[in-house]
């Protein structure tokens, strides 16, 4: 503990020396005065520019690149107050963000989506397992430490706001809309995780966002409105479940809430408008009844169906009328600024309402000290991003969250065994890099193991080849890379793959071990496996899968005993809290 405390103190001192504020969470009189003075000096159009957030593509961007020219114009000429970035390396990110800060009259609040930590967006930064992993480990300390590490790395690169945590509650196993992005289905546990998460970010100088209000954990497609989603259940259930989760986040002190394009007719007197444009949700519920006083942002307004219905400019005006403070990723920022300005001049929108939103944002910038120093030292980014301690923390989270849901005499594996083993990678998407990476790891750990990849639509002869290898094996590993679908099947195996897996299980009922990477629900379709383990990292943005390769290999070698507990209900047989040990 002393060593860690010293390391944290050293990092804090180095960050301060680099001009990265770690404190300032309460606005001082001086900061408030700066915000008010700055607001008073802005034209209507520049005020509106402050409340527009546009996206940046990461990676190396050369001077003269048309994309950079556009971003510079938006920062310098239109006064955009926020940008959200995606991709790049740590030095590339720091350089680009410094470049834009240099062009802006007012410091820019830089945002990113750190659901799995900075490594979700930045190559070489730390990437952690998904939210559900922390609940499976049941450790507020792990959440706090991961959030702290993410904030340290983010601020070192010039990022001030994360569009996390996801606080969507996972209720129904037949509709796992958010999957491992969710902290799970236990509201009290979710509340504890969110408090630790927000505290870790705040104590290390980054702002947080609760999303996706009114809740995306139990949504369905809306009949008669193709592409629209709704929460179709009684008002009392919505308030006790979805809204209670957001109340936990509000009480934890989140700075932003992100609304989603989701309708809740049961709490809006039958209105089928989504929260992004429905005042009864954005203001009536979130602000007036749940007590949120911070900044309310829309979700992406680029191509969603709500934009298709109302149009790019009109949807921004409607979002502001509903009570939003920030317009996220409009397709045309200049046109959006013009539309909002015209709405103010016509009397449709209140100029005072614009001022209130801008003042909130400026005050947050001052709280972070950006009015004094908006830049980071690019040469020192490597001291803080993707450090060995942070990477080790990601592995610790995986080790402590790995969940053994079923064990019919397979574990612990006897020393020296298995003598003959087969690994079958079942992958939903062709080109997924995870199965080949796992194959390499397993081959290094167990020389002689045979690995096969069930890619989309294999030839029948390939199934025969794999089945023949199974006959001579003492252990058959099913490595499952089959993520849930957003609004549909929780365990979307391809029919041919599922039939083959069931054939393998029937042939070797005591020898088949399934390891699910990112989807707890797959066991429902292969219930007869001898053992079933879960790791909480899903292909794409939703958690580090690779750390679970190491955890699983440790279990096979007898170096790790799974201790995670299921934080979401899979079935009546596997309720919340399920998880074996030995």
Locate the predicted segments by residue.
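Bacterial N-terminal signal peptides that target proteins for export
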Residues: 1-10
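Bacterial N-terminal signal peptides
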Residues: 9-18
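Preference for extracellular/luminal or secreted protein segments
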Residues: 22-74, 288, 309-582
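Second-shell residues forming the walls of enzyme active-site clefts
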Residues: 43, 83, 93-108, 112, ...
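Loop/turn elements at helix/coil->beta-strand transitions in domains of secreted/extracellular proteins
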Residues: 44-50, 78-83, 104-109, 155-161, ...
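Short acidic, glycine-rich surface-loop motifs adjacent to enzyme active sites
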Residues: 51, 55-57, 71-90, 173, ...
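Short glycine-enriched loops at secondary-structure junctions
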Residues: 57-60, 110-120, 160-170, 210-216, ...
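Glycine-rich anion/phosphate-binding loops
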Residues: 89-93, 136-149, 188-192, 238-239
């Amino acid at each position: 503990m002393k060593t860690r405390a010293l390391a944290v103190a050293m990092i804090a001192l180095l960050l301060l020396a680099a001009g990265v504020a770690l404190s300032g969470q309460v606005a001082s009189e001086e900061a408030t005065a700066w915000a008010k003075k700055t607001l008073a000096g802005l034209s209507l159009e520049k005020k509106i520019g402050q409340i527009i957030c546009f996206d940046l593509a990461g990676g190396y961007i050369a001077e003269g690149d048309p994309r950079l020219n556009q971003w510079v114009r938006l920062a310098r000429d239109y006064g955009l107050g926020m940008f959200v970035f995606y991709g790049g390396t740590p030095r590339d990110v720091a350089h680009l963000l410094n470049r834009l800060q240099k062009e802006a009259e007012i410091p820019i609040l830089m945002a990113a989506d750190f659901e799995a930590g900075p490594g979700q967006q930045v190559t070489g930064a730390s990437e952690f397992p998904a939210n559900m992993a922390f609940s499976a480990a049941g450790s507020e300390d792990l959440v706090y430490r991961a959030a702290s590490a993410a904030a340290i790395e983010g601020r070192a690169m010039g990022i001030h706001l994360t569009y996390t945590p996801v606080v969507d509650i996972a209720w129904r196993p037949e509709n796992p809309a958010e999957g491992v992005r969710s902290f799970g289905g236990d509201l009290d546990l979710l509340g504890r995780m969110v408090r630790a998460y927000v505290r870790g970010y705040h104590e290390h100088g980054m702002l947080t966002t609760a999303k996706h209000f009114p809740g995306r954990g139990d949504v369905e497609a809306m009949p008669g409105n193709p592409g629209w989603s709704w929460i179709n259940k009684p008002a009392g259930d919505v308030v006790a479940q979805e809204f209670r989760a957001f109340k936990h986040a509000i009480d934890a002190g989140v700075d932003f809430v992100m609304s989603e394009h989701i309708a809740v007719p049961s709490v809006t007197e039958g209105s089928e408008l989504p929260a992004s444009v429905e005042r009864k949700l954005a203001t009536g519920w979130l602000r007036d009844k749940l007590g949120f006083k911070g900044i309310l942002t829309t979700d992406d307004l680029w191509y969603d169906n709500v934009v298709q219905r109302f149009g790019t400019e009109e949807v921004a005006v409607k979002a502001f009328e509903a009570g939003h403070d920030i317009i996220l990723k409009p397709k045309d920022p200049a046109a959006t600024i013009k539309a909002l300005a015209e709405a103010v001049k016509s009397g449709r929108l209140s100029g005072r309402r614009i001022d209130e939103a801008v003042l909130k944002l400026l005050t947050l910038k001052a709280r972070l000290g950006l009015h004094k120093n908006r830049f980071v030292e690019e040469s020192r980014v490597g001291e803080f991003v993707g450090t060995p301690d942070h990477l080790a923390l990601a592995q610790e989270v995986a080790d402590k969250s790995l969940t053994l849901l079923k064990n019919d005499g397979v574990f612990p594996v006897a020393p020296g065994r298995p003598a003959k083993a087969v690994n079958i990678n079942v992958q939903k998407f062709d080109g997924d890099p995870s199965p080949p990476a796992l194959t390499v790891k397993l081959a290094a750990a167990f020389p002689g193991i045979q690995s096969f990849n069930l890619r989309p639509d294999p030839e029948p002869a390939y199934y025969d080849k794999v089945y023949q290898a199974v006959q001579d094996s003492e252990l058959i590993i099913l490595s499952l890379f089959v993520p849930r679908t957003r609004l549909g099947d929780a365990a979307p195996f391809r029919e041919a793959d599922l039939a083959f897996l069931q054939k393998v299980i029937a042939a070797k009922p005591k020898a088949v071990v399934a390891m699910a990477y990112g989807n707890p629900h797959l066991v429902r379709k292969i219930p007869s496996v001898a053992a079933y383990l879960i790791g909480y990292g899903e292909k794409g943005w939703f958690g580090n899968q690779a750390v679970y390769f190491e955890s699983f290999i440790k279990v096979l070698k007898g170096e790790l005993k799974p201790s995670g507990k299921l934080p979401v209900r899979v079935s009546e047989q596997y309720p919340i809290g399920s998880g074996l040990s030995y």
